[in-house]
A protein has these predicted regions:
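Active-site-proximal, structured, solvent-exposed surfaces of multi-pass membrane proteins
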Residues: 1, 44-182
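Catalytic cores of secreted or luminal carbohydrate-active enzymes
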Residues: 2-70
Length: 182
């Protein structure tokens, strides 16, 4: 079996709709809308709506399989040219004809930090829990670095506890040596 509607990781949209508009749609057809439009919070629609076109009302009802396959083809056409997982997160490259939000179907987590062309950038929580970043026009590199919550604290505690443990172990080794002499 080969999925003819496969979409690579990392792609852009032409349209957006707000979470309220998305929630007002009929539940069985919502998944088709996710191929056509990026779902933004009301606040993100105000801040980033300039990079996308609001989804026309007529587009909310054209949810046929034929249209779905066309939406998949449109997303493939705007997909990243490179996507690689690495030990820290993932790396992607893309060429965009205009500034746009690059969407990744990776669950949003506060542990991620995103860099576009080496500059830290805001990660948007879109499509009810996935991620997107704003990218400028042209060829861009995108890096997401993941560091779990609490890792810095755990490293600090470990480093602080290490000397205490060494002193504790050293004391008992010294005490044991002292007892053997007597």
């Amino acid at each position: 079996y080969e999925n003819d509607n496969y979409i690579p990781m990392g792609f852009t949209y032409d349209y957006y709709l707000t979470e309220t508009q998305y929630e007002d749609t009929v539940t069985p057809t919502r998944s088709n809308l996710l191929m056509r439009a990026l779902v933004l919070t009301e606040e993100d629609a105000v801040a980033y709506g300039q990079y996308l076109t609001p989804l026309p009302t007529a587009e909310l009802n054209d949810l046929t399989y034929t249209r779905y396959t066309q939406d998949c083809a449109d997303r493939r056409a705007s997909a990243c040219t490179t996507f690689e997982m690495n030990s820290a997160g993932f790396h992607a490259e893309a060429t965009l004809d205009r500034a746009n939000l690059m969407f990744f179907s990776v669950p949003y987590d506060d542990g991620f930090t995103a860099y576009v062309d080496g500059q830290e950038t805001e990660i948007l929580r879109v499509d009810e829990g996935l991620m997107a970043v704003l990218c400028p026009a042209g060829t861009v590199t995108i890096d997401f670095v993941y560091q779990p919550d609490g890792i810095r604290l755990s490293r600090t505690v470990t480093l602080a506890a290490l000397p205490v443990f060494l002193l504790y172990a050293g004391y008992f080794a010294w005490d044991e040596k002292k007892k053997r002499k007597h």
